[in-house]
């Protein structure tokens, strides 16, 4: 990676930015897997105005990648070309009550913070965020959900910037939500959203949040280096059941393992590379495909380039 060369190449275009530019940033420091390569340049904008100025300054042929807190992210060992953008909590992490049943939250606001704010205000419908270890931007992009509730059930309006730095607002319908998916254009960077719940007794909300936390601690390896659920649930079944039936519980490749505690959670046991993790995931997909004919779909977002000679084929090249 030649991050400083990219910064120098753009020169005066970036001179007025107030955010931080870091060349050759180590992505394994921010992803929950603690694995992966470098970002050519890592940019943390100071606020929405600074982000808009950055987007207007950077030529469109230079790739941009937006990341959140790194909880659902696998970075490949060859690194990420161009700029990687991460919204800071200082500039994009505020959350507030804007009506008796509505919450406005910045894209860098932790999901857990929204759940806690809803509890304080007696707003029901947000308890599921207590069990999602990400931030609002990622929840909006992938329609994050847990315990039978999804983000799309709470979204009223989303604010974003397009590749040219222009503000765009989208309604719930315009987000095009489906299971763990949004049809919003990939180039949009979400900056905030308004959510709506319903009036509910605080004791009831607290009980629901406690149940979410107890469930996580009982069945999920939350103290491991993990990206959360590895694969989406196929229609009519659960990913973990199919993984288990294919004999992949506890399966290990290098330092990567399918958790013995919850076999849809992939973990870094300490020495895993991005290659180990992705190769393990594709091995599981291949074995499930062979065993049941089901093509598991990744829920974890994989970004960046493979290290030369270490590309990983989907299903390890197995096509049935």
Swiss-Prot record:
GO cellular component entries: cytosol
Name of the top EC class for this enzyme: oxidoreductase
Catalytic residue positions: 180, 229, 299
GO terms of biological process kind: cell division; cell wall organization; peptidoglycan biosynthetic process; regulation of cell shape
Record localization: Cytoplasm
Record-annotated FAD-binding PCMH-type domain positions: 34-200
Enzyme nomenclature, EC number: 1.3.1.98
The keyword Cell cycle is assigned to this record: yes
Pathway: Cell wall biogenesis; peptidoglycan biosynthesis
One Pfam family cited in the UniProt record for this chain: FAD_binding_4
MF terms (GO), sorted A to Z: FAD binding; UDP-N-acetylmuramate dehydrogenase activity
Reactions accelerated catalytically: UDP-N-acetyl-alpha-D-muramate + NADP(+) = UDP-N-acetyl-3-O-(1-carboxyvinyl)-alpha-D-glucosamine + NADPH + H(+)
Annotated Gene3D superfamilies: 3.30.465.10, UDP-N-acetylenolpyruvoylglucosamine reductase, C-terminal domain, Uridine Diphospho-n-acetylenolpyruvylglucosamine Reductase, domain 2
Keyword list, A-Z: Cell cycle, Cell division, Cell shape, Cell wall biogenesis/degradation, Cytoplasm, FAD, Flavoprotein, NADP, Oxidoreductase, Peptidoglycan synthesis
Named cofactor requirement(s): FAD
Stated family: Belongs to the MurB family.
Function, as annotated: Cell wall formation.
Name under which the protein is recorded: UDP-N-acetylenolpyruvoylglucosamine reductase
Organism: Mesorhizobium japonicum (strain LMG 29417 / CECT 9101 / MAFF 303099) (Mesorhizobium loti (strain MAFF 303099))
């Amino acid at each position: 990676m030649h991050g400083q060369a990219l910064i120098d190449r753009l020169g005066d275009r970036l001179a007025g930015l107030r955010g931080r530019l870091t060349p050759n940033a180590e992505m394994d420091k921010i992803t929950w897997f603690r694995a992966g390569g470098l970002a050519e340049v890592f940019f943390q904008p100071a606020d929405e105005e600074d982000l808009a100025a950055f987007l207007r300054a950077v030529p469109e042929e230079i790739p941009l990648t937006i990341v959140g807190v790194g909880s659902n992210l696998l970075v490949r060992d060859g690194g990420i070309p161009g700029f990687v953008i991460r919204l800071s909590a200082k500039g994009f992490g505020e959350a507030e009550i804007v009506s008796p049943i509505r919450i406005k939250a910045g894209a860098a606001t932790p999901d857990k913070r929204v759940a806690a704010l809803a509890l304080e205000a007696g707003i029901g419908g947000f308890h599921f965020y207590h069990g999602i270890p990400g931030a609002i931007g990622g929840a909006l992009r992938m329609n994050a959900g847990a315990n039978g509730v999804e983000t799309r059930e709470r979204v009223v309006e989303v604010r974003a910037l397009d590749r040219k730095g222009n503000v765009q607002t989208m309604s719930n319908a315009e987000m095009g939500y489906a299971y763990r998916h949004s049809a919003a254009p990939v180039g949009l960077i979400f900056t905030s959203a308004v959510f709506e719940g319903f009036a509910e007794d605080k004791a009831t909300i607290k009980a629901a949040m406690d149940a979410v936390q107890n469930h996580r601690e009982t069945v999920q390896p939350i103290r491991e280096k993990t990206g959360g659920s590895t694969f989406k649930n196929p229609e009519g079944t659960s990913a973990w059941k199919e993984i288990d039936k294919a004999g992949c519980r506890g399966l290990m490749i290098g330092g990567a393992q399918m958790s013995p505690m919850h076999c849809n959670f992939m973990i870094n046991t300490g020495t895993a590379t991005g290659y180990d993790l992705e190769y393990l995931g594709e091995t599981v997909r291949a074995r499930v495909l062979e065993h049941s004919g089901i093509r598991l779909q990744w829920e974890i977002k994989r970004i960046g380039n493979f290290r030369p000679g270490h590309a990983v084929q989907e299903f390890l090249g197995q096509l049935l």
